[in-house]
UniProtKB/Swiss-Prot annotation:
<keyword id="KW-0963">Cytoplasm</keyword>
<protein>
    <recommendedName>
        <fullName>Peptide chain release factor 1</fullName>
    </recommendedName>
</protein>
<dbReference type="InterPro" id="IPR004373">
    <property type="entry name" value="RF-1"/>
</dbReference>
<dbReference type="InterPro" id="IPR045853">
    <property type="entry name" value="Pep_chain_release_fac_I_sf"/>
</dbReference>
<dbReference type="GO" id="GO:0016149">
    <property type="term" value="F:translation release factor activity, codon specific"/>
</dbReference>
<keyword id="KW-0648">Protein biosynthesis</keyword>
<dbReference type="Pfam" id="PF03462">
    <property type="entry name" value="PCRF"/>
</dbReference>
<keyword id="KW-0488">Methylation</keyword>
<dbReference type="Pfam" id="PF00472">
    <property type="entry name" value="RF-1"/>
</dbReference>
<dbReference type="GO" id="GO:0005737">
    <property type="term" value="C:cytoplasm"/>
</dbReference>
<dbReference type="InterPro" id="IPR000352">
    <property type="entry name" value="Pep_chain_release_fac_I"/>
</dbReference>
<feature type="modified residue" description="N5-methylglutamine">
    <location>
        <position position="234"/>
    </location>
</feature>
<comment type="function">
    <text>Peptide chain release factor 1 directs the termination of translation in response to the peptide chain termination codons UAG and UAA.</text>
</comment>
<dbReference type="InterPro" id="IPR005139">
    <property type="entry name" value="PCRF"/>
</dbReference>
<dbReference type="InterPro" id="IPR050057">
    <property type="entry name" value="Prokaryotic/Mito_RF"/>
</dbReference>
<comment type="similarity">
    <text>Belongs to the prokaryotic/mitochondrial release factor family.</text>
</comment>
Length: 358
């Protein structure tokens, strides 16, 4: 398939953006400027990849010719480089193909992550805490901002439920694969017989919604204030700072008591509610689109078992793509890059096959 016409359209768009960026009042609208700069960067990267692809194709053709030369030493050197050039060319083609696919605009969004302890009692709540710290460390490694929105601590130091927000460059693009049921196999500290217990935690990853994404009418909300039910301290239960919000048409419920200020809790609660409603809207649209097929990486649904963390064997297995790592300790310390790259590659191959570009 000849991608030159598509590339030329992207090149024209890049030139248009460069003209816009050069305007004196470009940064007056910071939000719009940020969106344009992101698009500009992606298109510039595509052009650089396209140029590298053409250069590599030419170099491969030159080496194939040199491999036929009468000079044995030169022919041998040229032939040795051919497999490496072929591998590089294959990757560059995949990168170009993927860049030409329609892009999900929510991939640039910040993310709201909700983690709930599942089966397994106290051990499940401890595992929910492990997952929270894993995402927090990953965010810190990438220079993203991490913020607690709401939590319900357990008696043993874990979480029955915890909600956080991660903000930064393309957060949702990297973390969208985390939605689903995470299973842990390990020996609890209280287990005297050394038996391995299995527990679960459910993760939901939602792109942060903007007001234009979801219309929330005031009459569709029921908002109540109440006293905080926190874990102690002089400010707990002294003022009615906790906020409960119900979205009447859908039944979605949010409670926020993380802040001492009722206004801040309401603001955070609305942020969570908006993300949940936006997620439901996106899921409904995705189900219509994919009704006749099954995504390789899955739907990201809360009921889908995606991963097992086996502590005795220091092993992590992602069941969607058959990925296995014996670096469980490192992964829980936030070293998620290899796993996420494998998931991104699997999604890319699936989307290319769908588009007939593989």
């Amino acid at each position: 398939m000849d991608y030159t016409p598509l590339i030329e359209k992207r090149r024209q768009r890049l030139e248009e953006l460069e003209t816009v960026i050069a305007e004196p009042d470009f940064f007056n609208d910071q939000k719009k400027a940020s969106e344009i700069m992101r698009e500009h960067r992606r298109l510039k990267e595509l052009m650089e990849t396209w140029d590298s692809l053409n250069a590599t194709e030419q170099q491969l053709a030159d080496n194939q010719e040199l491999a036929k030369t009468d000079d044995p030493e030169l022919a041998e050197l040229a032939a040795l480089e051919i497999p490496e050039l072929e591998a590089a060319l294959e990757k560059l083609r995949s990168d170009v193909q993927y860049s030409l696919l329609p892009r999900d605009t929510t991939e640039d969004r910040d993310a709201i992550i909700e983690i709930r302890a599942g089966t397994g009692g106290d051990e499940a709540s401890l595992f929910a805490g492990d997952l929270l710290r894993m995402y927090q460390r990953f965010a810190e490694e990438r220079g993203w901002r991490f913020e607690h929105l709401e939590s319900s601590p357990s008696d043993v130091g874990g979480f029955k439920e915890v909600v956080c927000r991660i903000a930064g460059e393309e957060v949702f693009r990297f973390l969208k694969y985390e939605g689903g049921v995470h299973r842990v196999q390990r020996v609890p500290a209280t287990e005297t017989q050394g038996r391995i217990h299995t527990s679960t935690a459910t993760v939901a990853v939602m792109p942060e919604a903007e007001e234009v994404d979801i219309e929330i009418r005031p009459e569709d909300l029921r908002i109540e204030v109440c006293r905080s039910g926190g874990a102690g301290g002089q400010h707990v239960n002294k003022t009615e700072s906790a906020v409960q919000i119900w979205h009447i048409p859908t039944g979605v419920y949010v409670r926020c008591e993380e802040e001492r200020s009722q206004m801040k809790n309401r603001e955070k609660g609305m942020k969570i509610l908006r993300a949940k409603l936006f997620e439901a809207k996106k899921r409904e649209e995705a189900e219509k689109y994919s009704a006749a097929r099954r995504n390789l990486i899955g739907s990201g649904g809360r009921e889908e078992k995606i991963r097992t963390y086996n502590f005795p064997q220091n092993r992590l297995t992602d069941h969607r793509i058959g990925y296995t790592s014996h670096n469980l300790d490192g992964i829980l310390m936030g070293q998620l890059e290899d796993l996420i790259m494998a998931l991104q590659h699997a999604e890319m191959q699936e989307r290319l096959a769908e588009a007939g570009m593989s």
